[in-house]
Amino acid sequence: MTKALNGVRILDFTHVQSGPTCTQLLAWFGADVIKVERPGVGDITRGQLQDIPNVDSLYFTMLNHNKRSITLDTKNPKGKEVLTALIKSCDVLVENFGPGVLDRMGFSWEKIQSLNPKMIVASIKGFGPGPYEDCKVYENVAQCTGGAASTTGFRDGLPLVTGAQIGDSGTGLHLALGIVTALYQRTVTGRGQKVTAAMQDGVLNLSRVKLRDQQRLAHGPLKEYSQFGEGIPFGDAVPRAGNDSGGGQPGRILKCKGWETDPNAYIYFITQAPVWEKICDVIGEPDWKTHPDYAKPAARLKHLNDIFARIEQWTMTKTKFEAMDILNKDDIPCGPILSMKELAEDQSLRATGTVVEVDHPTRGKYLSVGNPIKMSDSPTEVMRSPLLGEHTDEILRQVLGFSDQQVAEVHDSGALEPPRKAAAAE
């Protein structure tokens, strides 16, 4: 079956997580992603957080499925020739270098456009234009500068970063959408364009409900936040609210049976207004249906701590899965806190391809996330990540049409690897 992005060729200069997230998603949709790596070194994540000596790390393998790898020294004159030919042969160049790196390589936007007017140049940066645009940014820096950390955690505690990679992977997903949109626009204009996604912008986009709340503060307290019910005044910035729901329906994480020994024996419980009476029945408080302090959503806001304390008395008598089964029958929104171990062993996620087992030639079988987006006419087959330079000769021949002699000349130039040394005279 033809894949959605079949025929699209991506020149991938990305490394670590943000850019590879973007290009891996495009590869899953069928694009031919050519990952350009330094000879003998490659993407730095190949050697980071290694759990097995002398093999590509999971950090690398889980971000570079379905790609081809070519090693290329872009400072080498022959390497520049190869890169020039690749630019002419590809549809999109994706990079997450520091500011100005492409220009210093001799491939400015203007130069690239002169070589291939249809090429889309997509970039991930830490910040957009402004006072911080030259600053180096990593995942947690993006979370802190994008508004996520200041609004995550408990009111009386430190700002916290989330375990989800909303800065790196989140921005990569944003960029992928920009690339696909630019490809579509190119069908109309016939031209390439620059596409940029800044990590600060991406995190702020994912934190938009907190920007919503910042504006609401000008008109009064945020009544769904627990501190309102506790009578604690609000300041001039959105506070950290623990596990309070970010929407209009109050919610909390509550203990379940076994919480004393299981760090994940918890459930998220939302007191949604349409099912309030069912909640009262489940927890054994039928009088709350008509009690003036509890019957109406507005009245309940001042008593949320008491309400959730009572609900927790009930959830502590059930495992998180027992509680979920009971609550789901009454359409009461809830969700168990699932550990990574539980997710890895969840057979339903295996069946949908959300979690996949991949076989790798040097590290063996491992688990990875699959494509989170399912398309009926473009199913995803997750293929292992490439070994360093595994497809170098294949790309030179198939993509650039090089002859055997031309391939040998590139090798001997040192552009792909150290030049072959003649045997020492005896």
UniProtKB/Swiss-Prot annotation:
Identify which top EC class this enzyme belongs to: transferase
- Enumerate the residues binding CoA: 17-18, 38, 72-75, 96-98, 104, 136-139
- Output one GO MF annotation: formyl-CoA transferase activity
State where substrate binds: 247-249
Q: Known EC number(s)?
A: 2.8.3.16
User: Active site: which residues?
Assistant: 168
GO BP terms: namely:
oxalate catabolic process
Q: Which residue spans adopt a coiled-coil conformation according to this UniProt entry?
A: none
Instruction: Please state the pathway this protein functions in, per its UniProt record.
Output: Metabolic intermediate degradation; oxalate degradation; CO(2) and formate from oxalate: step 1/2
Any idea which UniProt keywords this protein has?
Transferase
Report the catalytic activity.
formyl-CoA + oxalate = oxalyl-CoA + formate
Pfam families linked: CoA_transf_3 (PF02515)
Regarding protein family, the annotation reads: Belongs to the CoA-transferase III family. Frc subfamily.
Q: Which PANTHER family match?
A: SUCCINATE--HYDROXYMETHYLGLUTARATE COA-TRANSFERASE
**Database matches in HAMAP family:** Formyl_CoA_transfer
Report quaternary structure and partners: Homodimer.
> What is the recorded function of this protein according to its Swiss-Prot or TrEMBL entry?
Involved in the catabolism of oxalate and in the adapatation to low pH via the induction of the oxalate-dependent acid tolerance response (ATR). Catalyzes the transfer of the CoA moiety from formyl-CoA to oxalate.
Its name, as the record gives it, is: Formyl-CoA:oxalate CoA-transferase
- Native organism is Rhodopseudomonas palustris (strain BisB18)
